[in-house]
């Protein structure tokens, strides 16, 4: 069984959501139903790969210990970086070992679970979380089945607030109706539209540069329908359970600049990076007076932030280049916004917005082409044909 794949999963999901709907209509909590199904799903998904199941359980236990230790430490300022490093260490090992042709002990969803765990640890340090989560709440948050494999990346405080929120029957029915719509739309995106696009992407790599251009457009459409489809299904299932899991996409292809794009694409990832990487790098640089100008600080922070995002996807050349590429785009646009008189004069004009949109979309699609790894394959084929 796989998350949001196959008849067996959707039949089981349908049964659980029907029970959840009935319970919510009668204003009964679905907390334990959701927790039970999340644990059961982990068992059925990983039962054929016991090494991954053991690794996942080990990660959950390690995370709980780190959370408890962080809450009890007196000098958190010195120890917090160590706790964050320990929380991220399994993911680092999983990402790095394949570079040396060694199989790691990774498991489905480790990247997303790591960010959830790091969020808890940092927010305990920031005293936004006053006391550590209970065993059940912690396990439920980490293993919440709709978002386990590919997000969206929720925050623990928001997640737990949803379970404690008292909704009227009318409020729940409105949320459930939205959830059903999102679930059906996500199914259509992922099973129909992404499948249709994928059929046109399976041809052999051709040496003509027009092949790469065509592939760039196709891959962009495929990536959106596949990933947005999964995210919609995850959010829709969450809504029917009574959880308002945050949306991951907000019409990204109407973005008029690269910052606007990252406010609309993979939103829970970009906001996580903004809150826990970018803003903290900026604060540290300003506190240490690393750079004289705030603009330089912001530009360097964007480079670090997006390069980190590339490594999070994987320690391979295409992912790293993708991260650096978006770091350059974000840093360059930051400079352009702050320094360009042309931008300040024309930014609100219709012709400028249309031109900016067209340029932004092609820069974004070029990034997706890099992300796909196809340019490296194309270059290697050209070299082999010499």
Question: Over which residues does each language-model region extend?
Answer:
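Membrane-embedded transmembrane alpha-helical bundles that form the catalytic cores
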Residues: 1-386
């Amino acid at each position: 069984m796989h998350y949001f794949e196959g008849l067996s999963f959707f039949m089981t999901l349908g049964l659980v959501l029907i029970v959840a709907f009935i319970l919510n209509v009668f204003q009964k909590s679905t907390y334990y139903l959701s927790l039970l199904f999340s644990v059961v799903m982990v068992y059925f998904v990983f039962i054929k790969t016991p090494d991954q199941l053991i690794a996942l359980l080990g990660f959950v236990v390690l995370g709980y210990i780190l959370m408890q230790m962080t809450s009890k430490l007196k000098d958190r300022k010195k120890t917090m970086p160590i706790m964050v490093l320990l929380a991220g260490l399994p993911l680092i090992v999983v990402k790095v070992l394949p570079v040396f042709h060694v199989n790691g002990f990774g498991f489905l969803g480790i990247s997303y679970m790591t960010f959830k765990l790091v969020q808890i640890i940092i927010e305990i340090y920031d005293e936004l979380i006053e006391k550590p989560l209970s065993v059940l709440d912690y396990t439920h948050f980490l293993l919440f089945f709709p978002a386990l494999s590919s997000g969206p990346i929720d925050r623990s405080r928001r997640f737990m607030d949803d379970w404690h929120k008292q909704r009227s029957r009318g409020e729940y029915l409105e949320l459930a109706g939205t959830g059903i719509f999102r679930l059906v739309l996500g199914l259509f995106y992922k099973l129909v539209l992404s499948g249709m696009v994928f059929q046109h992407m399976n041809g052999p790599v051709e040496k003509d540069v027009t092949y790469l251009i065509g592939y760039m457009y196709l891959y962009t459409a495929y990536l959106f329908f596949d990933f947005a489809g999964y995210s919609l299904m995850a959010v829709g299932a969450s809504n029917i359970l009574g959880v308002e899991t945050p949306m991951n996409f907000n019409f990204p292809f109407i973005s008029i600049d690269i910052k606007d794009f990252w406010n609309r694409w993979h939103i829970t990832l970009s906001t996580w990076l903004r809150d826990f990487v970018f803003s903290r790098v900026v604060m540290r640089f300003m506190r240490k007076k690393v750079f004289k100008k705030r603009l330089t600080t912001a530009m360097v922070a964007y480079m670090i932030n997006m390069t980190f995002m590339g490594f999070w996807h994987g320690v391979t050349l295409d992912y790293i280049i993708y991260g650096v590429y978006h770091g350059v785009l974000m840093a360059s646009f930051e400079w352009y916004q702050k320094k360009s008189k042309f931008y300040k004069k024309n930014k609100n004009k219709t012709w400028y917005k249309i031109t900016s949109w067209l340029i932004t979309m092609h820069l974004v699609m070029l990034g997706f082409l890099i992300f796909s790894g196809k340019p490296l394959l194309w270059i290697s084929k050209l070299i082999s044909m010499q």
